[in-house]
From Swiss-Prot:
The keyword Protein biosynthesis is assigned to this record: yes
Domain S1 motif: 12-83
Transferase as UniProt keyword: no
Family designation: Belongs to the eIF-2-alpha family.
Subunit and interaction comment: Heterotrimer composed of an alpha, a beta and a gamma chain.
Alphabetical list of Gene3D superfamilies matching this protein: EIF_2_alpha, Nucleic acid-binding proteins, Translation initiation factor 2, subunit 1, domain 2
Keywords from the UniProt entry: Initiation factor, Protein biosynthesis, RNA-binding
Pfam families: EIF_2_alpha, S1
Protein name: Translation initiation factor 2 subunit alpha
GO terms, molecular function: ribosome binding; RNA binding; translation initiation factor activity
Amino acid sequence: MIYSRSKLPSEGEILIATVKQVFDYGSYVSLDEYGGLQAFLPWSEVSSKWVKNIRDVLKENRKVIVKVIRVDRRKGTVDVSLKKVTDDERRKKNLQWKKIQRLDKILELVSQKLKLSEKDAWEQVAWKLEAKYGDPITAIEKAVKEGEKILIDAGVPEIWVKPLLEEASKHAEERKVKMSGLITVRTNEPLGVEKIKEVISKALENIEQDYESLLNIKIYTIGAPRYRVDVVGTNPKEASEALNQIISNLIKIGKEENVDISVVKK
């Protein structure tokens, strides 16, 4: 379980959330980085484009990336937005979330070995490394390569140091794989470039949440009308499945938006 130093997030914070309940007027989500704290996602903050049915965008138990827009510290309530998260913020958060998950797994296993709680692990290891170095998992990986001094200098208690380094060495960052595909994209619609961007944006929605091993996705022109789709991840099977899903999404959404998309090579 992931523990945060603060009970409540701050306005503007970008977070991972799990959709719990969906209603016509909005959705309740739990904030994964705040112990499952409940937050409200209003209907007006779901999408910047008109959506007929909120359930076309939100599905229960799906993970989404949200931005905190209101915090009432007296009442302990939080409101979040889906539409205010930019593509760049979403990409960065996905990368950060993968690091957090790796950190959480290491701390879970080490705390079990020491017969201590996961909360102890977060308080005595993760939070101290965060205060000293900013990114706990990067600090741990550096300590595996350069030695325990990095942990000791941050104030990590000695009882954690050796088992932490032993476990972290088993969870070294996996080798990256890249899968690519070539497509052609054509449209006679007015504002064609904007229309193509819209199709691409829709096709990528939730892909990185659905495939946890993905690190990066890029779709870019290599000379109109040809575009390249690159998927980078640590699991070849998931990267291949994600590439196929993206291309399938592009073709389907393209038809709906009068954008002709065909596969050149996968």
